[in-house]
Amino acid sequence: MKKRYYYICMLSVLLLMLVLPTKAASEAEFGKLVKSYTLRTDGSQEMRVQKELTLFTHAAMNGLYGESFIIYNPAYQELKIHESYTRQKDGSIVKTPDNAFVEVLPSAAADAPAYNGLKEMVVVHTGLELGATIYLDYSVITRPG
């Protein structure tokens, strides 16, 4: 009787483990993601984005989060990058070099001549490794009008 009870309990536990959903491991985790909007008295606007992202997998490092994309229109907007660096797992800091800021035409505007004035800043994050944290702080300032 005790043996049968033991087997039924073990079978129930195993079935529960199969049926209950499991939490998948994260590719990356945001430690901080802040988007703030400021409307100034002269009518200009500032959108500031601050993010800290820790990478846990090679897929996150090489494909998903290895680059950040910022779309803006230089005819009436200004992009200001306040800070961009990577803190490696051992604590050392790798500043983003100047050649890691690449300005391109957004892919959505490729076949639309009316939108060829748009720009996309591609920030290529350097010094990435498993456990590294990306820090990016930038503003897009829109002129009044």
Task: For the regions a language model picked out, list residue spans one by one.
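Bacterial N-terminal signal peptides
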Residues: 9-19
